[in-house]
Amino acid sequence: MDVTDADVAEVGEDIDAVLDALSATVIADRELLETVLLGVLARGHILLEDIPGTGKTLIARSVARTLGLSFSRVQFTPDLLPADVTGTHVYNEGAGEFEFSPGPVFANVVLADEINRAPPKTQAALLETMEERQVTADGETHDLPEPFFVLATQNPVEMAGTFELPEAQVDRFLVKTAIGYPDGAGETELLRRRAGRDRQSPTAEEVLSAAAVRALQGVPESVRVEEDLLEYLVTLSRATRERSECDVGVSPRGTQRFFEATRVRAVLSGREYVTPEDVKRVARPVLAHRLVLTPDAAVEGVDKRSVIDDVLDEVPVPTV
């Protein structure tokens, strides 16, 4: 199926309605909210690195509510076990047999809060479900609901009590980004909204349904990407592998995720084709976290995002 202007226009109306509903609930940059929706439509997952208290839980809960999806939150701690996330078999006395009791990962939107406070084995259990979209327990396989989207948060690695995520696991996230502090006007609006209600947390309006979200996820699959832009994507990824600051550049899997993100970005921009501007807008959040700096570059404080910026400046942009 080819994507038509009408398809994109209809999707654009749905996306605008979702963003408006989120903006009425969450004090956050619209670009950030679009990035979260990009993850949902691309069937990817998002890693937010931020300090506590910046609204990560509210954003995740509001996204689930607005999209008509189920939501669960897992607080990662040093004593959290893999079964606490995925579920386990418990004995049913009435039936006289063991039955699988699903864990909190069985939801459409899962907030994995402070994922780097849990030990590596528990981190791996979640990341495996992200990749496979299913849970295997005692030889039985249980499919996760569709759509399935993980929004994981982590504290900056310099904070105490954290276990840094291995590079191979970070690579499984479509996007890594941050919320950051709101500006002065935003923080004032936060207090104004709090003063106007008797509950601590606001509730977002439901705009779509799970079935509608699944339909939206299919639209980017037919967005056109010209041959010159395919070569541009590959050239950008390969250029990261040749940078002197990097021990490891973007993997082939990362290049595929890059491609998928550009198509969703085109849909969010109301187009049925990808442009170089789409590529540039998603390059930082999709590629930077996939780089592994050399020890010297890490000591010098090289910013991975600046490496991506340099690559974008150096690689010729195709004319399409």
Outline where the language-model segments fall.
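C-terminal engagement/docking regions of AAA+ P-loop ATPases
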Residues: M1-V3, L58-R61, E242-V320
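Conserved C-terminal "switch" segment of AAA+ ATPases
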Residues: V8-G12, T25, T162, I179-V250, ...
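Pre-Walker A (pre-P-loop) alpha-helix and adjacent loop at the N terminus of AAA/AAA+ ATPase modules
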Residues: V8-I46, I51
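Conserved alpha-helical scaffold flanking the Walker A/P-loop in AAA+ ATPase domains
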Residues: L37, Y91-L111, E140
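Walker A/P-loop
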Residues: V40-P78, P82, Y91
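Walker B catalytic acidic pair
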Residues: D50, D113-E114, A125
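P-loop (Walker A) phosphate-binding loop of NTP-binding proteins
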Residues: I51, V85, T153
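Canonical AAA+ ATPase core
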Residues: N92-A95, A118, E132-V207, A215-E221, ...
